[in-house]
């Protein structure tokens, strides 16, 4: 496959290296060049997808493949199967300085900053050499390709945006909170609830947004509260608790998805969040702004497909337990995972008496339950599924020894650090503190291997799906065809012409099957999907909306 590297040059120009050919282009000429070369299906190599791809999309140019050097360097440097010394060399310290960028950033670096003009070809050669020298080169290569494809999908989703009815959103806010308040003031609905809370606790000046004041009020009322989380408040009995919980719920809506949020993140009838691929250590995505990974049910009615279009919403049932079966090679658990409900499959196979027992045991194994009903279930199921439960147990023990663990494709966990045995002042920590830190890191590594591999499956899913959707309709730019508009760990939302809804749903299912086959070649693992075709995102999963379980 042809690799074409792109590097920025001073003077609003860039250098293109295509095999043995090198040429300089004006930045404004790049879209036409990329469009012409896409027919050859090259892999575009650049420092950061979020810095290169948005302008191409704006020009109507979509690319199939890329290699994101920033993401790749971070991945290879931490991969246990790769030698990080192979990444050293000229400009390596500047590559280490690269940080995630958002499409809205006007300029991350000054024009004389070395990080602005890095040599993509040199860094690409280093990363390719590090992968080639690894004893797990095929897996690492797949992970690098999937990670970069995810970056393309993220940029495309921000570009296309989630169709958004501003009038519906404003009506929801007004119904729940009252009219839009002046800047810095509470809405009428919140102010009324605050007055109820003050009256119930007998403190006229109480600020329910202040955690210290709220804790003091709770204790003054004789309530045993150590924090003000909703889960803690629900356990307390007092006339002020109900209005306080309602206040906290609506205050969160006002702060995170209120009028100011819409002003910043909704434009042209589209909600355009900024995703950060591999934003967490496990490879899961995070948000660079807009709350892309936090989409409250209260505002979902405002996400309405365009006229003549629909949403196809699909989520994976029990992703991480199925991933555990696949990565461990546990055929007994894989048999239980056949069909729509893995937990019920465990019951049907005679592993446990009830579905709740199955859920307690599997989640307990992945999160380290050692006591209570969950701990008892873990002990029993370990004998039934020794490979699956043994994998997470060994990951936990490795973490407790201070060792790094890895996902199926080779993403490495962050290390405990050489100073794990020291306290904050650099002195040897006491044995109890060391043991607590080891156990805490062991709980992290136990979950890391499964959650990280689940993220790899999801990357392979959307990497394949974005190309399948593109091929469903062979005319027009990205947003005139079926396309991804939202992704959340184990859920995708596709915006598609209604006439292509069934075809889009079929492609979502086929991409899920292909991702499972790609990762777990020797073991057949089902990844059933709950699929809905709806006009409003709020209707997904409701009776009458589901097409079928695939």
Language model regions located:
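Conserved DEDDh/DEDDy metal-dependent 3′-5′ exonuclease domain
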Residues: 3-5, 9-136
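Short active-site loop/helix that positions an aromatic residue
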Residues: 50-60, 70-80, 214-222, 317-332
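Conserved "right-hand" nucleotidyltransferase catalytic core of DNA-directed polymerases
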Residues: 1-19, 108, 117-292, 308-310, ...
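Polymerase palm active-site segment centered on the conserved acidic dipeptide of motif C
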Residues: 48-49, 175-207, 385, 499-550
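Short glycine-rich phosphate-binding loop at a beta-alpha junction
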Residues: 40-52, 204-207, 315, 380, ...
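Function-dense linear segments that define catalytic or interfacial modules
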Residues: 96-97, 119, 274-353
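Conserved catalytic core of nucleic-acid polymerases
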Residues: 159, 348-487, 493, 498, ...
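Short, contiguous acidic/charged loop-to-helix segments that flank catalytic cores in large enzymes
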Residues: 259-263, 280, 290, 299, ...
């Amino acid at each position: 496959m042809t690799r074409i590297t792109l590097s920025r040059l001073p003077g609003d120009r860039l250098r293109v290296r295509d095999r043995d050919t090198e040429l300089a282009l004006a930045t404004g000429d790049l879209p036409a060049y990329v469009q012409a070369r896409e027919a050859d299906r090259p892999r575009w190599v650049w420092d950061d997808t979020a810095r290169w791809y948005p302008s191409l999309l704006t020009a109507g140019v979509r690319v199939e493949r890329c290699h994101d050097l920033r993401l790749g360097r971070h991945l290879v440097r931490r991969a246990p199967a790769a030698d990080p010394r192979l990444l050293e060399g000229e400009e390596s310290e500047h590559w280490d300085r690269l940080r995630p960028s958002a499409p809205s950033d006007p300029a991350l670096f000054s024009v004389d900053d070395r990080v602005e003009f890095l040599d993509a070809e040199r860094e690409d050669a280093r990363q390719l050499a590090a992968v080639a020298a690894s004893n797990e080169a095929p897996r690492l290569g797949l992970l690098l390709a999937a990670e970069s494809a995810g970056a393309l999908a993220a940029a495309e989703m921000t570009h296309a945006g989630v169709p958004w009815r501003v009038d519906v959103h404003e009506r929801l806010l007004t119904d729940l909170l009252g009219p839009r308040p002046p800047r810095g003031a509470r809405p009428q609905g919140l102010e009324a609830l605050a007055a109820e809370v003050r009256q119930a606790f007998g403190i006229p000046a109480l600020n329910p947004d202040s955690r210290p004041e709220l804790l003091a009020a709770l204790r003054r009322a004789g309530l045993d509260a150590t924090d003000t989380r909703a889960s803690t408040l629900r356990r307390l009995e007092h006339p002020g608790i109900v209005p306080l919980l309602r206040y906290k719920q609506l205050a969160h809506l006002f702060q995170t998805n209120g009028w100011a949020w819409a002003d910043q993140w909704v434009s042209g009838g589209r909600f355009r969040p900024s995703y950060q691929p591999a934003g967490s250590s496990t490879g899961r995505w995070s948000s660079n702004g807009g709350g892309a990974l936090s989409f409250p049910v209260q505002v979902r009615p405002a996400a309405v497909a365009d006229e003549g279009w629909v949403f196809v919403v699909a989520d994976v049932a029990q992703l991480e337990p199925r991933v555990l079966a696949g990565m461990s090679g546990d055929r007994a658990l894989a048999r239980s995972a056949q069909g729509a409900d893995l937990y019920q499959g465990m019951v049907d196979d005679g592993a446990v008496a009830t579905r709740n027992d199955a859920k307690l045991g599997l989640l307990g194994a992945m999160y380290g339950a050692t006591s209570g009903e969950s701990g008892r279930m873990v002990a029993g199921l370990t004998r039934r599924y020794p490979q699956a439960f043994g994998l997470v147990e060994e990951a936990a023990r490795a973490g407790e020894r201070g060792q790094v663990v890895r996902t199926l494709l080779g993403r490495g966990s962050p290390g405990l650090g050489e100073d794990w045995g020291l306290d904050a002042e650099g002195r040897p920590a006491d044995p109890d503190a060391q043991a607590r830190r080891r156990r805490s890191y062991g709980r992290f590594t136990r979950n890391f291997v499964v959650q990280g591999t689940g993220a790899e499956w999801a990357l392979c899913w959307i990497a394949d799906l974005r190309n399948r959707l593109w091929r469903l309709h062979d005319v027009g730019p990205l947003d005139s065809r079926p396309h991804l508009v939202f992704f959340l760990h184990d859920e995708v939302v596709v915006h598609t012409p209604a006439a292509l809804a069934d075809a889009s749903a079929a492609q979502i299912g086929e991409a899920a099957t292909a991702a499972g086959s790609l990762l777990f070649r020797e073991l057949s693992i089902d990844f059933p999907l709950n699929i809905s075709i709806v006009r409003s995102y709020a209707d997904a999963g409701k009776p009458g909306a589901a097409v079928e379980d695939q």
